[in-house]
């Protein structure tokens, strides 16, 4: 139902509203609509609180009340993302305005760790730290492996709790729920702040106007010790919603559709800001926003930020009125909410975005993701025709197992009871697992009767926590089985056997599928007779009554997009600079190799996730030996990898390498295999942080991937020894490829690998680097 013109994805009928987008450049001063497009030749790329001294949990450094004043016109217009980062950046020069691309020293309002708290604590102690810089900044939750009652796991949990008590850190034991949900419902992730976590789904905090982004274990240890860590402000994409969702269409359908329809890495390593008219944004509840923000991770983004608006204000005031504990009430204090909305932080007029995307919500229908990929999204009505039998269904995860989700699933069964006049059960041969996002959300569902409705239908309860979503505990998919889940990630092997098939869908569709035994919906959605496709594409929609409804304002937007287009287009068409004798050479830090050379080992696949690199079943086994890590490296992607790879090989893969979870072992297992360098077409940001922090160098070389696919595409293998030689001269920033004995030799310039990153790697990673820096103090 789509057609492409240039890089604009258009519905097969005229747009209902003007779009500033592609495919041709035109300017009309008689209209508020301006069109801008890239020429075809350009490529688009129960809380246990331990305190040593009494202190308010709302006090951090910088102050949680230091939100920028949006009415004070800055010299440099900023996006909402840039404004929030500005408020939590240390050491900025006087008059400096944070912009995308800046490296900043970030002091987050909060930092959450979960089951990985103990490995983080070991890093914290290894760098020589003895005292947590700001205990109020840290939150610990146990949520991933809560069904594991082994002595080893219980001892680890005990060690985490003891550490929290010793340092006065807020601690939530196993059974209280998924850490991200706790951060939301307990008010730690507060609007207008920066909140990070050592988990890839920190993006979820954007659902409440809090800039949430993932960090990795080493970053978390650094924050514990110093209160800060480095961060590069990503390019920022504005995603504009228009219209409202039809009945039967949910937030899960929105993000599944976005991930599947914009599936060419359009927002890879971007920060996202979701916008829309007042009517549109009011139609999206906070729970809906949390679902969308949560899965911006799977879409490839580093943040997914919703506005600080009236919908959020109503939610906050409800939380303030119903907070039952003193500590929670303090975080949702009326005074704090009043201060926030007395002058809410918004993007400035004229703020520059690197990309503009849009989606008309009214044209959307229920969607299903998979199998085994979030980049494959299919309208439910198409899948229903195939009557795909399922073996397991899951209503789990921080994405979609809040009380509202449980209510939606329960309604499917209640409606079936009303239709049949008698009890209904989960289909024969289907196992339906349910785990609430938190203990508090489960209590709400129980009081409403929704939890019991699912249990009466034969659902299998699991403790509040991550459950099957992380691939741990009861109910994992077995070889050959098919499952459908309301969770966020369906990568191969993520939820059990690599030989199973996993689909993702809304709670309603999961419940209906469990009831019917095949992938199906509850029948609520009715497609309009005049529907001709999903309205989605690149560009900015100009809506009547919006702030872009004068010629002058449209001109400002046109100029901003023109600047962005010229910049990215010139990069796309200009030849890469060669490094000749007159080129500036890079200084080499002692201990860092001047040259890295080896045979190219080609893993011909895009979107290899961290689950593919290092299976989830090993992630929380903290005593896995280096030899074992090397043995299981890439196990989910290619079981034969271990026998093919050799020490010293240059690891080369496709695009969006290292997407998915923030597990550190994805990098350290490659190092354990004695592979000195990872090269890919593009690399996920969180994996990049893990790699550098653990002393694994990286390069992005799209041209090399394209050439390898030209040479070996006719006989595709998961892992191939190519016989090609790869040589990276770090000093001259030059890569030379010898395409096998007697083959072509060619060279390419690559970005300089700066001495500061060399130093971290030469020291053996960020942990050892920080330890060295502390010893200097």
From Swiss-Prot:
PROSITE patterns: ACONITASE_1 (PS00450). It is found in: Mitochondrion. It comes from the Eukaryota. The keyword Iron-sulfur applies. Its EC number is 4.2.1.36. Binds 1 [4Fe-4S] cluster per subunit. Induction: Expression is slightly increased during growth on ethanol. GO terms for cellular component: mitochondrial matrix. The keyword Metal-binding applies. Its cofactor is [4Fe-4S] cluster. Keywords: Amino-acid biosynthesis, Iron, Iron-sulfur, Lyase, Lysine biosynthesis, Metal-binding, Mitochondrion, Transit peptide. Its main location: mitochondrion. Residues 47-74 are annotated as: Disordered. It catalyses: (2R,3S)-homoisocitrate = cis-homoaconitate + H2O. Residues 1-35 form a transit peptide. [4Fe-4S] cluster binds at residues 398, 466, 469. GO terms for molecular function: 4 iron, 4 sulfur cluster binding; homoaconitate hydratase activity; metal ion binding. Pathway: Amino-acid biosynthesis; L-lysine biosynthesis via AAA pathway; L-alpha-aminoadipate from 2-oxoglutarate: step 3/5. InterPro entries: Acnase/IPM_dHydase_lsu_aba_1/3, Acoase/IPM_deHydtase_lsu_aba, Aconitase/3IPM_dehydase_swvl, Aconitase_4Fe-4S_BS, Aconitase_4Fe-4S_dom, AconitaseA/IPMdHydase_ssu_swvl, Homoaconitase_mito, Homoaconitase_swivel. Residues 52-74 have a biased composition (Low complexity). One of its GO terms (biological process) is cellular response to iron ion starvation. Catalyzes the reversible hydration of cis-homoaconitate to (2R,3S)-homoisocitrate, a step in the alpha-aminoadipate pathway for lysine biosynthesis. NCBIfam families: h_aconitase. Belongs to the aconitase/IPM isomerase family. This is Homoaconitase, mitochondrial. The gene is lys4.
């Amino acid at each position: 139902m789509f057609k492409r013109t240039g890089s604009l994805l258009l519905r097969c009928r005229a747009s209902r509203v003007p779009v500033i987008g592609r495919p041709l450049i035109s300017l009309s001063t008689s209209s508020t609509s301006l069109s801008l497009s890239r020429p075809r030749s350009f490529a688009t790329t129960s809380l246990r609180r331990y305190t040593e001294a009494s202190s308010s949990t709302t006090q951090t450094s910088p102050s949680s009340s230091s939100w920028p004043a949006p009415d004070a016109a800055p010299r440099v217009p900023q996006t909402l993302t840039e404004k929030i980062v500005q408020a939590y950046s240390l050491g900025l020069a006087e008059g400096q305005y944070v912009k995308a691309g800046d490296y900043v020293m970030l002091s987050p309002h909060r930092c959450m760790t979960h089951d990985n708290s103990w490995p983080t604590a070991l890093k914290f102690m290894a760098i020589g730290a003895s005292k947590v810089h700001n205990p109020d900044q840290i939150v610990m939750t146990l949520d991933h492996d809560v069904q594991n009652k082994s002595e080893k796991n219980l001892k680890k949990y005990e060690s985490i709790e003891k550490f929290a008590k010793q340092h006065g850190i807020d601690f939530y034991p196993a059974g209280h729920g998924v850490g991200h949900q706790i951060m939301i419902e307990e008010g730690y992730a507060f609007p207008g702040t920066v909140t990070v976590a050592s988990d890839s789904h920190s993006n979820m905090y954007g659902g409440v106007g809090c800039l949430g982004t993932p960090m990795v274990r080493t970053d978390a240890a650094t924050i514990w010790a110093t209160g800060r860590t480095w961060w590069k402000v990503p390019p920022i994409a504005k995603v504009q919603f228009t219209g409202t969702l039809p009945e039967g269409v949910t937030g899960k359908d929105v993000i599944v559709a976005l991930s599947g329809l914009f599936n060419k890495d359009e927002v890879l390593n971007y920060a996202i800001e979701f916008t829309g008219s007042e009517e549109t944004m009011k139609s999206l509840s906070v729970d809906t926003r949390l679902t969308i923000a949560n899965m911006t991770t799977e879409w490839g983004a580093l943040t997914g930020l919703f506005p600080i608006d009236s919908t959020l204000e109503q939610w906050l005031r409800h939380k303030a009125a119903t907070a039952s504990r003193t500590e929670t009430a303090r975080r949702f204090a009326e005074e704090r909410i009043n201060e926030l909305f007395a002058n809410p932080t918004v993007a400035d007029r004229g703020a520059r975005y690197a990309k503009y995307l849009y989606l008309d919500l009214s044209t959307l229908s229920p969607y299903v993701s998979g199998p085994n990929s979030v980049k494959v999204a299919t309208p439910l009505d198409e899948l229903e025709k195939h009557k795909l039998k399922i073996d397991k269904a899951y209503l789990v995860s921080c994405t979609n197992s809040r009380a509202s989700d449980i209510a939606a699933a329960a309604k499917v069964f209640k409606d079936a009871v009303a239709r049949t006049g008698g009890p209904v059960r989960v289909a024969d041969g289907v196992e339906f697992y349910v785990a609430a996002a938190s203990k508090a959300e489960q209590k709400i569902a129980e009081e409403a009767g929704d939890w019991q409705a699912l249990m009466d239908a034969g659902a299998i309860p699991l403790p509040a926590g991550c459950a099957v979503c992380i691939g741990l505990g009861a109910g994992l998919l077995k070889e050959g089985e098919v499952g459908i889940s309301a969770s966020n990630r369906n990568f191969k092997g993520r939820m059990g056997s690599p030989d199973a098939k996993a689909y993702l869908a809304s709670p309603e569709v999961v419940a209906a599928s469990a009831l019917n035994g095949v992938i199906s919906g509850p029948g609520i959605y009715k497609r309009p007779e005049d529907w001709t496709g999903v309205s989605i594409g690149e560009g900015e929609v100009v809506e009547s009554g919006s702030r872009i409804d004068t010629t002058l304002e449209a001109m400002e937007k046109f100029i901003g997009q023109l600047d962005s287009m010229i910049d990215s287009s010139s990069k796309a068409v200009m030849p890469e600079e060669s490094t000749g004798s007159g080129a500036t050479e890079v200084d080499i830090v002692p201990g860092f190799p001047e040259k890295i050379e080896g045979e190219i080992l080609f893993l011909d696949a895009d979107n290899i996730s961290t689950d593919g690199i290092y299976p989830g079943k090993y992630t929380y086994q903290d005593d896995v030996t280096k030899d074992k890590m090397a043995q299981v490296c890439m196990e989910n992607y290619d079981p034969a990898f271990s026998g093919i790879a050799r020490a010293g090989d240059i690891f080369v893969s496709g695009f969006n390498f290292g997407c998915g979870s923030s597990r550190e072992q994805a990098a350290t297992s490659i190092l354990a295999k004695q592979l000195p360098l990872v090269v890919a077409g593009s690399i996920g940001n969180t994996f990049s942080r893990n790699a550098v922090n653990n002393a694994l160098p990286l390069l992005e070389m799209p041209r090399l991937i394209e050439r390898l696919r030209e040479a070996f595409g006719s006989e595709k293998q998961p892992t191939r020894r190519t016989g090609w030689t790869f040589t990276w001269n770090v000093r001259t920033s030059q890569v030379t490829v010898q395409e096998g004995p007697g083959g072509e030799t060619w060279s390419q310039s690559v970005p300089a690998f700066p001495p500061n990153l060399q130093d971290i790697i030469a020291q053996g990673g960020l942990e050892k680097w920080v330890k060295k820096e502390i010893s200097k103090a």
